[in-house]
Amino acid sequence: MSRRRIALTRLFRRASFRLPQARRRAVALPVSYLRPAPLAQSLLLIAPILLFSIIAHEYAHGYAALKQGDTTASKLGRLTWNPIKHIDPWMSIFLPLMLYAAHLPILAGAKPVPINPSNYRNYKRGDIIVSLAGIATNVALALACTIVVAITGFIGEEIPAASGVCSVLQAMAWVGIGLNLILAMFNLLPVPPLDGSHVLKYLLPPALAQRYQQIGFAGIVIVLILLYTPAISYWLFPAYASASLLQNGLRSLVLPETSQLLSAARF
């Protein structure tokens, strides 16, 4: 049984990902779309961390399912960090590139991890744990990226010869803070097939919960519509605010080269 997982990242002009220039400017909350930028510079910063984040999200679902008694993902070879096993040509590559080229919100996802909830030792508990595992992983990655920004900033300052490598890693980690918090909050949307729907259904009366889970393809349409309405910005605001809070605390460790990298990519 396969569960469709969709990951989202909306990139903004004054995004929380943006570094303060020369370590003096405060980080602003996102309010508008990312300006058109050279594709190569943007992909250098976005693609590695986005790919790793959505793969980690799916891996977490499969691993949590294994711990709850479902060995489906393990038997099919999906409990691996090999990106080739998780990449979906359409959702992971072509669709994000097409949306980026059209200056639209970027929708991307990894190949869904196969899961059979009927194998859970406790269906309800297992379903909730597996559904929240991906979200928890993205939050953990955001915190890990925060640590990477701090470490690379310290090393880059103390060892000038390493500042080039450190600035690239720091820029990707900086983007990763906001990106992973957005992925976590987006997947909490209570719209099937997103993770939040697997929690909300247990708060509804049984008859209503069954109809709610049968939304199917209409749920994807609802999500796509939300992406083009102000409602999604309100829903994602906790992610924006959290990213801004974390990044503001890191301003003193930002390398000048990092600021230049993000400026070139128009973050």
PLM feature spans:
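Hydrophobic transmembrane alpha-helices and their immediate loop junctions
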Residues: 2-267
